[in-house]
Amino acid sequence: MDCKILVLGAGGLGCEILKNLTMLSFVKQVHIVDIDTIELTNLNRQFLFCDKDIGKPKAQVAAQYVNTRFPQLEVVAHVQDLTTLPPSFYKDFQFIISGLDAIEPRRFINETLVKLTLESNYEICIPFIDGGTEGLKGHVKTIIPGITACWECSIDTLPSQQDTVPMCTIANNPRCIEHVVEYVSTIQYPDLNIESTADMEFLLEKCCERAAQFSISTEKLSTSFILGIIKSIIPSVSTTNAMVAATCCTQMVKIYNDLIDLENGNNFTLINCSEGCFMYSFKFERLPDCTVCSNSNSN
């Protein structure tokens, strides 16, 4: 059976996932969704893009790159917010693989897929494979809606500060004041000294200006707030992206070839490359009181 795959995100992880899919003969069509555009700072790890692509939509450029070089695979780009797409869009795919860098879109797609499964009485059950990276660490969650733990079941495994901003494309679509601070401090003025009072006051001024451009509240903005954000910024590492993307695609291949026990097999993989290379897989159990997938909420 030929497969139609949906990839969420065309950043560092999404590019790696898309590259891997070009090498799978059973994958005939891939749709990729991303609202962001390409920035100079992306080019060190998002290798489907180059200098001439700066300012262009990521999904569009990634699709064009693959379609030109791999004619056996059709890639369709969607330059939009995935939360604006209707449920009918998602039900056409055999697998959905996420390379997203934000929490809320993951929660949205998880809830959408669980709802599709339950409302169809399991006639529609689309595996959702979620990859995530944070510096030299990463994870892969394999979710079979209505059968295994859903994404919401494991939300308590996230760091307590969920709004820690990864080093990704925030230039054209800042959603909060944290995104503003990251852009100003790491892209516009990366050489300022955070120990200098004058430099921190300058950053505060520039953050206020950028926030005003995007109608973002500056209520909690201060030099101490900016310092806290700068210290929490996590870089994106290409090798971690490659390992997580490979694990995502391996899980998909296992499911496609019926090589995994969907109900009782391991569905959560942790990757830690901060001291050597460590990978650990285990079964994450469903929460009986999960607000998305528990029996009490699905009736």
UniProtKB/Swiss-Prot annotation:
GO terms classed as biological process: protein neddylation
Superkingdom of origin: Eukaryota
Residues that, per the record, bind ATP: 12-37
Keyword hit for Cytoplasm: no
Protein keywords: ATP-binding, Ligase, Nucleotide-binding, Ubl conjugation pathway
EC number: 6.2.1.64
Pathway: Protein modification; protein neddylation
Catalytic activity: ATP + [NEDD8 protein] + [E1 NEDD8-activating enzyme]-L-cysteine = AMP + diphosphate + [E1 NEDD8-activating enzyme]-S-[NEDD8 protein]-yl-L-cysteine
GO MF terms held by the record: ATP binding; NEDD8 activating enzyme activity
Pfam families (UniProt xref): ThiF
Any one annotated GO CC term: cytoplasm
Keyword flag S-adenosyl-L-methionine: no
Top enzyme category: ligase
Active site: 168
Protein role: Catalytic subunit of the dimeric UBA3-ULA1 E1 enzyme. E1 activates NEDD8/RUB1 by first adenylating its C-terminal glycine residue with ATP, thereafter linking this residue to the side chain of the catalytic cysteine, yielding a NEDD8-UBA3 thioester and free AMP. E1 finally transfers NEDD8 to the catalytic cysteine of UBC12.
Further information: Present with 752 molecules/cell in log phase SD medium.
Oligomer status and interactors: Heterodimer of UBA3 and ULA1. Interacts with NEDD8 and UBC12.
Family classification: Belongs to the ubiquitin-activating E1 family. UBA3 subfamily.
Protein name as catalogued: NEDD8-activating enzyme E1 catalytic subunit
Source organism of this protein record: Saccharomyces cerevisiae (strain ATCC 204508 / S288c) (Baker's yeast)
Gene: UBA3
